[in-house]
């Protein structure tokens, strides 16, 4: 039976990737359907109750800059906010919010309900409607068929998901939810290259059984930062502290004694886990020289009786989990409310995707989130936004869009996946971005909001606020450039008292701001009239631009140099066997990845500068350059 309505875009899965995908498609005007197993779990935080962090916060800001929901939901649900790396340079500073799970889920549901052009339907998807090599809709478990121009799969850990606790295991998409076994089988039958990954979660603990007095308190920042460029502190719920404790040698002895019943160390689990978020048993084995590991004790919510012990993800048997938890300071009398577990699931080789996140093997089918081998809410949400946008554009026969590595962390994320692939869950870090000085959290709106507006993602309210901010930045910069100080003036004496190098020539306040020992607060103290009506975000942008102008200019010059490679397009049908001089290994890699540009080809592991030179010679000789 076919559903009455047809859609431009169908999104399968209501997690962080799915919600952003559905919202992005609908914001551009596409008739969008979001299909989920359970509408009550839309936007659910399946693992840790937090948004942001190093590299991840940058993605959240970029999602927000393009009209996405994640940052606004974090502002409405955040019960502790911190700026990580606050003492370091602006490129690596990152916002992190501890979130109330219930409030976050509520904010996501309200955002979905308020979105025009978006419908919700609760059913498990078991099959795709395929016409030739094109996706044309989906089929649900009760045989209901939905037709659409494009389909976006954002199915998280549900594809053939299997949950492990000790040597016991069972099918599941996450604790309490069934897996998507039929859909996983169908995708395998369609010829997609599949492998297995695993992730895990720690046991939850009854907060009433925890002695917080034996732990170190970790309060949030004051004043609290906001996540969204449109956010305000007034939106934040009451703020609370987290706590820190540590494992000890007794903890490690218990873990080592239980390894003979660990699914990881007995070969039961075959999937590869996240390198940068390993289980506690993995940490104890890999870092045997360490006598303790830090645990962040995080509240699950203002009204929740559960806490999340971040740092002891485990799939050990329950009796070992309980002994391990009670060996930790502050947890001596702890009661576990839910055991930790590991989950194995299918993912598909992201090198089989285009930069738009459309699959190469099947037209009109897009993948986003953990199905592509990533880990983390933020990585999933960013992919969801891109896939939803491009599915909507494909449905209307428009060209796809994606950001470059020099434009957004989202561009770095997608290019890494498409070009390099991954054999382990991929997590974003600032170190993955070669142009991180220009890809800061603080300027995500300046980088992406204008593009988002052109793509139909940014509404009038956000655009108006952005234009006002951009104008204020230009105004303040012009004011500082116009106000000048002569070395023989009375003002120069007060400036010389602030700096190690006396003023030798006439200089503008903007030039003075470039000095490392002069801050904007010094200038504001001497010329407060210049700062009337200028908020903190505007002042911050002007100061960063002044302080780092030389570094930014050099990075921009490097970006322009590299862009020349990106301008050389490579046809998808290119026969690399005809490129004279390439080794068989290089030909195989180029044929496997099928890079879209010479720049992407240069980033494929094992492709040498000599091979790129041969490729350029071939392009010029054949008239393709």
From Swiss-Prot:
The keyword Ubl conjugation does not apply. GO terms for molecular function: flavin adenine dinucleotide binding. One of its GO terms (cellular component) is cytosol. Its cofactor is FAD. Keywords: Cytoplasm, FAD, Flavoprotein, NAD, tRNA processing. GO terms for biological process: tRNA methylation; tRNA wobble uridine modification. FAD binds at residues 13-18. InterPro entries: FAD/NAD-bd_sf, GIDA_C_N, MnmG, MnmG-rel, MnmG-rel_CS, MnmG_C, MnmG_C_subdom, MnmG_C_subdom_sf. Gene3D superfamilies: FAD/NAD(P)-binding domain, GidA associated domain, C-terminal subdomain, tRNA uridine 5-carboxymethylaminomethyl modification enzyme MnmG/GidA. NAD(+) binds at residues 273-287. The keyword NAD applies. SMART domains: GIDA_assoc_3. It is found in: Cytoplasm. Pfam families: GIDA, GIDA_C_1st, SAM_GIDA_C. NCBIfam families: mnmG_gidA (TIGR00136). NAD-binding protein involved in the addition of a carboxymethylaminomethyl (cmnm) group at the wobble position (U34) of certain tRNAs, forming tRNA-cmnm(5)s(2)U34. Belongs to the MnmG family. HAMAP family: MnmG_GidA (MF_00129). Homodimer. Heterotetramer of two MnmE and two MnmG subunits. This is tRNA uridine 5-carboxymethylaminomethyl modification enzyme MnmG.
């Amino acid at each position: 039976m076919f559903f009455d309505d047809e859609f431009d875009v169908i999104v399968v899965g209501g997690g962080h990737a799915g919600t952003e995908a559905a919202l992005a498609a609908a914001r551009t005007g596409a008739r969008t359907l979001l299909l989920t197993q359970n509408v009550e779990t839309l936007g659910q935080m399946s693992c840790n109750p937090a948004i942001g962090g190093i590299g991840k916060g940058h993605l959240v800001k970029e999602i927000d800059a393009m009209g996405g929901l994640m940052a606004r939901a974090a502002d409405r649900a955040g019960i502790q906010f911190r700026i990580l790396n606050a003492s370091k340079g602006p490129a690596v500073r990152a916002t992190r919010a501890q979130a109330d799970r219930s409030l976050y889920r509520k904010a996501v549901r309200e955002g979905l309900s308020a979105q025009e052009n978006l419908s919700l339907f609760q059913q498990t998807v078991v099959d795709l409607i395929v016409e030739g090599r094109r996706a044309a809709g989906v089929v649900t478990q009760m045989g209901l068929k939905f037709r659409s121009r494009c389909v976006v799969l954002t199915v998280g850990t549900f594809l053939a998901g299997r949950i492990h606790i000790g040597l016991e295991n069972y099918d599941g998409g996450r604790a309490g939810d069934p897996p998507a076994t039929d859909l996983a089988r169908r995708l395998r039958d369609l010829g997609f290259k599949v492998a297995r990954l695993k992730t895990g979660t720690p046991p939850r603990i009854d907060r009433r059984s925890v002695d917080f007095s034996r732990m170190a308190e970790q309060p949030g920042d004051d004043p609290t930062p906001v996540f969204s460029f449109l956010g305000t502190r007034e939106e934040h719920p009451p703020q609370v502290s987290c706590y820190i404790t540590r494992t000890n040698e007794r903890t490690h002895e218990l873990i080592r004694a239980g390894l003979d019943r660990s699914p990881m160390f007995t070969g039961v689990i075959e999937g590869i886990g996240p390198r940068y978020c390993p289980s506690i048993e993995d940490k104890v084995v890999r870092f045997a020289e360490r006598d303790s590991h830090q645990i962040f004790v995080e509240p699950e919510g203002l009204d929740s009786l559960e806490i999340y012990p971040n740092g002891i993800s485990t799939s050990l048997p329950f009796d070992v989990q309980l002994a391990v938890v009670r060996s930790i300071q502050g947890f001596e009398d702890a009661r576990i409310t839910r055991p930790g577990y590991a989950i194995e699931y299918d993912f598909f080789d992201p090198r089989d995707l285009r930069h738009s996140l459309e699959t190469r093997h099947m037209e009109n089918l897009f993948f986003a989130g953990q199905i592509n081998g990533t880990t983390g809410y933020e990585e999933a949400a960013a992919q969801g936004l891109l896939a939803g946008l491009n599915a909507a554009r494909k449905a209307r026969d428009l060209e796809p869009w994606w950001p470059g590595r020099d434009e957004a962390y989202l561009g770095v994320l997608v290019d890494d996946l498409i070009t390099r692939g991954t054999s382990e869950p991929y997590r974003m870090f600032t170190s993955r971005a070669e142009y991180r000085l220009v890809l800061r959290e603080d300027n995500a709106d300046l980088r992406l909001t204008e593009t988002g507006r052109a793509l139909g993602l940014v509404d009038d309210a956000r655009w108006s606020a952005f234009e006002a901010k951009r104008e204020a930045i230009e105004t303040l910069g012009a004011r500082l450039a116009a106000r000048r100080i002569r070395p023989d003036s009375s003002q120069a004496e007060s400036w010389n008292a602030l700096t190690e190098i006396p003023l030798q020539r006439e200089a503008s306040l903007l030039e003075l701001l470039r000095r490392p020992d002069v801050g904007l607060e010094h200038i504001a103290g001497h010329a407060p009239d210049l700062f009337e009506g200028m908020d903190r975000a505007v002042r911050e942008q002007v100061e960063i631009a002044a302080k780092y102008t030389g570094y930014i200019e050099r990075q921009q010059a490097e970006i322009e140099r590299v862009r020349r490679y990106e301008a050389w397009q490579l046809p998808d049908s290119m026969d690399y066997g005809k490129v004279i001089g390439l080794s068989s290994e290089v030909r195989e890699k180029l044929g496997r990845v099928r890079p879209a540009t010479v720049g992407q080809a240069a980033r494929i592991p094992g492709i040498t500068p000599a091979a790129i030179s041969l490729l350029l010679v071939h392009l010029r000789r054949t008239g393709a350059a």
